[in-house]
Design a protein with these regions (language model features):
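Surface-exposed amphipathic alpha-helical segments
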Residues: 12, 40-42, 48, 157-189
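Sec-dependent N-terminal signal peptides
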Residues: 21-32
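Secretory pathway targeting signatures of secreted, lumenal, and periplasmic proteins
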Residues: 43-102
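Signature of long, low-cysteine stretches enriched in small and polar/charged residues
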Residues: 46, 56-58, 92-154
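Solvent-exposed coil/turn segments that connect beta secondary-structure elements
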Residues: 80-82, 127-131, 158, 166-168
């Protein structure tokens, strides 16, 4: 018997009603895994545990620690409403100010702009001693040594979405690819 090319076999498939139903159910299940706010949707990377929404947060993800790190990381997706939450530049400055170098001055930050699915996105990458835990209303300001912050601001049709991924530098580095997956999954809903 002569081998038959795969595409020839695929074109001869007959989809039964049961196969069609299973296909639709699988597509619906995949879309339910996507989260959304402000006219945008995204999909969290596998291995990141969703902790759901919190006040001012559309989503929060817990990331397990990398080998050698005592603490895990957190990725928060913020949405404050149309025209709320401050400008892109104001948020970049605030995030830069939360990370300091060994000299106590704000740490250097890499800022980049790109487009993902026709959405303007500005990213920040900075490392150092992190003093942004607990948010601006925290009673005390504890500082976490050797942390890294990857952030992104996605300019959506109903307002900006702010993504802030913070944690021990090694844990964030081990999950940088997953953070990129998260960013690349953002699209209009």
């Amino acid at each position: 018997m002569e081998p038959v090319p795969f595409l020839a076999l695929a074109s001869e498939w007959v989809y039964t009603p049961r196969m069609r139903i299973v296909s639709v159910v699988l597509l619906l299940a995949a879309s339910l895994l996507a989260e959304s706010v402000a006219g945008l949707k995204w999909t969290a990377p596998s291995g990141w545990k969703s902790e759901g929404a919190r006040p001012m947060r559309a989503a929060t993800y817990a990331i397990p620690p990398a080998n050698g790190d005592a603490a895990g990381a957190e990725c928060a997706v913020y949405y404050f409403g149309p025209g709320q939450g401050g400008s892109v530049e104001a948020n970049l400055q605030r995030w830069k100010g939360q990370m300091s170098g060994a000299d106590g001055k704000p740490a250097n930050a890499k800022i980049a702009k790109r487009t993902i699915h026709d959405l303007p996105v500005t990213t920040i990458d900075t490392s150092g001693d992190y003093a942004g835990m607990g948010g601006p209303l925290a009673a005390s300001k504890s500082v976490a040594k050797n942390y890294r912050l990857l952030g992104a601001i996605v300019e959506g049709p109903e307002g900006n979405i702010f993504i802030k991924f913070t944690g021990p530098a090694a844990t964030v580095a081990a999950n940088e690819h997953q953070f990129e997956q998260l960013l690349n999954s953002f699209e209009k809903w």
